[in-house]
Amino acid sequence: MESNFNTESSSTFTLQSSSETLFSIQLLDFKTSLLEALEELRMRREAEIHYEEQIGKIIVETQELKWQKETLQNQKETLAEQHKEAMAVFKKQLQMKMCALEEEKGKYQLATEIKEKEIEGLKETLKALQVSKYSLQKKVSEMEQKVQLHLLAKEDYHKQLSEIEKYYATITGQFGLVKENHEKLEQNVREAIQSNKRLSALNKKQEAEICSLKKELKKAASDLIKSKVTCQYKMGEENINLTIKEQKFQELQERLNMELELNEKINEEITHIQEEKQDIIISFQHMQQLLRQQIQANTEMEAELKVLKENNQTLERDNELQREKVKENEEKFLNLQNEHEKALGTWKRHAEELNGEINKIKNELSSLKETHIKLQEHYNKLCNQKTFEEDKKFQNVPEVNNENSEMSTEKSENTIIQKYNTEQEIREENMENFCSDTEYREKEEKKEGSFIEEIIIDDLQLFEKSFKNEIDTVVSQDENQSEISLSKTLSLDKEVISQGQTSNVTDNRKSVTTEIKDKICLEKDNGCTEFKSPNNHFVVLDTAIETEKIHLERTRGLDVHHTDVNLEVENNKTSFNSILNETAHNTYHNNNKDVSENEPFKQFRLLPGTREHALEKEITNSDQTKADLDSSLDIKKNPVPCQKYSLRNSSNVMLDDKQCKIKQIQLLTKKSECSILLSKQTSDFLQVCNDTLEKSELTVPCDIVIDHHVSYAAFSANSKLLLKNSDKNVHSMSMLVKPNSSPGGKTMCKNMSDMQNSQFNNCLGYLENTNVNISHLHLNNENSHASQAKDVKTAVHMKTCTETEFSNKKNQIDENQVTEATKNDLFLFVSINERQHTLLNNTEKTESLNDIVSGKMFSEGQLEESHSFHIEPSGDLVNRSGRSTFDLSTSDKKTEKTPVYMNFSDPGPWSKVNHIESQTASSSTPCISLLLKERPLDPSENKKIISMALCKNIGVDDVGKDIGPDTTSINRVADTLNNWSIHPDPKGEPSEEKNAMAKTFYDSSFPTEHVKTKPLISTPLQSHLQAIKTTKNTSGDDDWQSLITNQLNKSENLLSLENDNQPKKRKAEETLEKNNRLK
């Protein structure tokens, strides 16, 4: 019993303890659940407060935008009235001018007839003059022969005279010697006479002495006799005296003997002297005879000299007379030549004046046509504005399932309003730029003077004569106006922006198609101006590959002229890519009325990354984009006025650099933060371009063109900043740059990606600080979508040149995917270069074409961006964009920093196209991303995308037709892509360099950086993809394709005429040169 009791008590105890534990566990669970519920309530309250604040801000912004819209509409109405009045006055003036011109034309015709008659008379006179010239030449030849004979005779006379002078010189020398000898003889004779006188005096003295001595002898003899007598007496004494006397006598004898000897000697000397005198006299007489003979010879020679001199004088007189006659004949001939040249010069001047007047008349007519077309475009825009407001209501309906998507749709509406306002501002600016008769152009004329007008006229002429002079004009403008060309390139990019913007103003949905058709219409008007644009390149390739090649070769410069008159082919293609980016972006904006970009668009218009975020926001309304594409197809029917208007805008924008700069500065004041960052990036890019390309500055504005829908003024201002800061900042804009023609673009991609890292990081940090609602890359899609969004983020980072920031796993994932995509694309690109389109299956061909497009882009240093977009599989872009707009908390700082191109390529080709278009506008890469992204669900869809991307100009209908497995169209597309990648500047990028570029892109080390450089290239493809979307949405218009083919045929005919006219011009020039030579 006790044991049973114990067991029961223990069991009850255990039951009690277990119940207590369960109760405590339940309490703990309840407490934890309570705490969790409270925490959730607190989080929800905070989220609701946050969302309410955001909603309040959005409401305020919408109200402000509505007010701005009303003010802009009022301004628009006033401007429209003023424009109508001005156009009425201008039409009247034009009619008056036309009447006056017709009258002047009749006068000029009469004058030309009279001048033709005068020319005939002059020709007859020329013939007579030629005959006279021939006769004169004969006479001159005869006179020359006579002159030669006279010269020969003269030379003989001169030789004889020279010999005579020599003889005379020798004779005069001898005569001088004779005179000297004669003078010496005279001196010797005088000295001899003096010596004779002296000797005679001495002889007299000696004789006197002899006489005295004789007398003394006589005395002595008498004395001796006396002495002898005395001696005899005195013998002794006398003997002594005798001895003494004898001694004296001996002495005296000795003296006598001496004197006698002296006398003999003197006599001998005198005889000798006399003999010498006789010899001297004989020689003197001989010399006198010689002198007489010489004098006679001299007289004879002088007489001969006189005769020769007289003969020479007569000959010289004859020669002078002959020379005077020759001079007179030459003067007459020169006078005749001068008269003939003057007559020819006057005739040529008259002809040139007439041609210039005719050209002016043609230019005025073309300008009138353009103004008329612009007025029609403006009217169409005014009509389309009403539809735009109605369409916004339908398009702004959010299709996103999440609350964030709803918020994104609301914000997209606000951004659409902002975008519409900004586009209205841009449109007004474009109206000012493009209306030649509006007050805006008058203001510009005041500011920039006649120089801008001349440039505008030149631009119009260039558009009219694109086939004839576009290449030359582009080169000449680049050479003569380097500064203007830079500004023009910026302005042309701006123009492209303005084109996209103006079309956006009329209907954001319709802008892309209208621009494409406008380009086609411009092809009609301008011969093939837009025919040469990348879109038209695709059209040409669809029509005929050979014709396309010819046109591309002929119109490389033309492409440049249309997009950027001053840009060369490389820059032209970048500009075309930028145009395509703009159009795609505009279409995407238009299609995605979600323009949730507004704030990021304001701050990041210049930053490609921010553009992509804005595009991501736009992506939220993919369904709306489809509806917008449908509307855009409808608008394609009216492309001509818009395109012409855009071209007009481009020409005016090129010319109106100053005003565009002012407007850009104004826009920059609003967007100064991001625009400065962009300007730094673009300036860095410009520096890299300067290192790699001679025309890097021009390519930079092309990069700027990517944000056309934002505001061309802002881009131009940024481009200014870029140009100014190009030396300092050389890095970040390389992403946008598409160095189509130069291998330097390849290095640019690398260098710029490297150099952009620091600056772009700064820009990203700045973007974070700016509180811009960057469409973050956070995607609320499936895990695959999230990874794709990460890839997109990394791709965006790669575009923005922030490799360091994107070293994350996401970035690595993107790099891996990019490298794979790059490998595939590079292989496709190689196949493109080889044009091995037949090897590809239908599906593979479509993919290869997509890859080819991307590969071509890669060849231009932008392959990697497209590859980065390949990485992104089709995701719920709507969810992505919806969350990206509002999921700021979920978004990483890196993603915030990277306003990277959100190129979301969905498997659905059309949604891809929409996304790509929106992204291409921002970064120009997404279109390639579409082409490079994962295979669409159906190969037929791929084919559709490819053919339509290529056939954007050809027509959406053609794209719809190409939806089937059309291998020929695919081959054409591949050829077009190959040609397009190669043609931008065949000199700039040889095939080897392109292969090297493909290899570099193939390297896994560079994928992220290279993706940066690709965006521009992708934009044209995206625009084509937009066209494809529109074609898919609407049935193809056969008429549109026929129009395109007709335009292509016309352009071919014009080119053939141009080629035919060139040899004629050459022949005419050669004939003129021959005539001048004959004269």
Swiss-Prot record:
It comes from the Eukaryota. Residues 1052-1079 are annotated as: Disordered. Residues 1061-1079 have a biased composition (Basic and acidic residues). Residues 59-210, 236-384 form a coiled coil. The keyword RNA-binding does not apply. It holds the Pfam family CCDC73. Keywords: Coiled coil. This is Coiled-coil domain-containing protein 73. It comes from Homo sapiens (Human). The lineage of its organism: Eukaryota, Metazoa, Chordata, Craniata, Vertebrata.
